[in-house]
Amino acid sequence: MNNIWWQTKGQGNVHLVLLHGWGLNAEVWRCIDEELSSHFTLHLVDLPGFGRSRGFGALSLADMAEAVLRQAPDKAIWLGWSLGGLVASQIALTHPERVQALVTVASSPCFSARDEWPGIKPDVLAGFQQQLSDDFQRTVERFLALQTMGTETARQDARALKKTVLALPMPEVDVLNGGLEILKTVDLRQPLQNVSMPFLRLYGYLDGLVPRKVVPMLDKLWPHSESYIFAKAAHAPFISHPAEFCRMLVALKQRV
């Protein structure tokens, strides 16, 4: 049985769907879900194959987006963190009428480094794929440690992420592998030039996975979008800076 796990909280007049990153699940939002559900009708989702959304194998980005969309409200602000940012972006591209605003958090339209494009070296992503088959729990933990490195609260932030992972059964190796394949191969830089809904991009200055150098490059490529950098955050600004993060979303709600 392959059902998407979906939880709805709050009764705000605007729907907000939160999509988590690679290796994780919707429990990662527990640090902000109370605050956000007082302003929005909040939707917490486990991506296909992750957390409680069992019974899925490795999916393409397009299939992942379609699977999530099946249970979604007619119209919502879609927020995606990291890998989830690609899923939210894909939904904005294929079903713009369902997307009131697009928010990407510590996400890149092209995670993999390319010619004159900063990102994760492809051999690093390939290395993670290789290590998954050897010791996938340790590989996921290494990936999580990378996400909080450099912040003042790095240790406790990493603990919060690890707790999220361990709270639920680990995803299957092929699901994790499929997620890494998306990070390694997808490039939405050009397609996202054409989205017309409000588009907010949030970054961490200390992020080791999405280099801050991409921010001005995307400002130029997508002049209709807005960007904001959390000065002391790494890859998970909603964990290190929850109050500031929520304020940004409440401010966006006033504008849509």
From Swiss-Prot:
Molecular function (GO) terms for this protein are:
pimelyl-[acyl-carrier protein] methyl ester esterase activity
Q: Where, per UniProt, does this protein localize? A: Cytoplasm
Chemical reaction(s) catalysed: 6-carboxyhexanoyl-[ACP] methyl ester + H2O = 6-carboxyhexanoyl-[ACP] + methanol + H(+)
Q: Where is the AB hydrolase-1 domain?
A: 15-242
Q: State whether keyword Electron transport applies.
A: no
Q: Name one GO biological process term.
A: biotin biosynthetic process
Q: Name the major location.
A: cytoplasm
| Binding of substrate, residues | 22, 82-83, 143-147, 235
Q: Which GO terms describe its cellular component?
A: cytoplasm
Query: Which superkingdom?
Result: Bacteria
What keywords is this UniProt entry annotated with?
Answer: Biotin biosynthesis, Cytoplasm, Hydrolase, Serine esterase
**What EC designation does it have?**
3.1.1.85
SUPFAM superfamilies attached to this UniProt entry? alpha/beta-Hydrolases
Q: Extract the InterPro entries matched here.
A: AB_hydrolase_1, AB_hydrolase_fold, BioH, Carboxylesterase_BioH
The similarity comment for this entry is: Belongs to the AB hydrolase superfamily. Carboxylesterase BioH family.
Q: Which PANTHER family match?
A: HYDROLASE ALPHA/BETA FOLD FAMILY, PIMELOYL-[ACYL-CARRIER PROTEIN] METHYL ESTER ESTERASE
Q: How does it assemble?
A: Monomer.
Designated name of the protein? Pimeloyl-[acyl-carrier protein] methyl ester esterase
This protein's species is: Escherichia coli O17:K52:H18 (strain UMN026 / ExPEC)
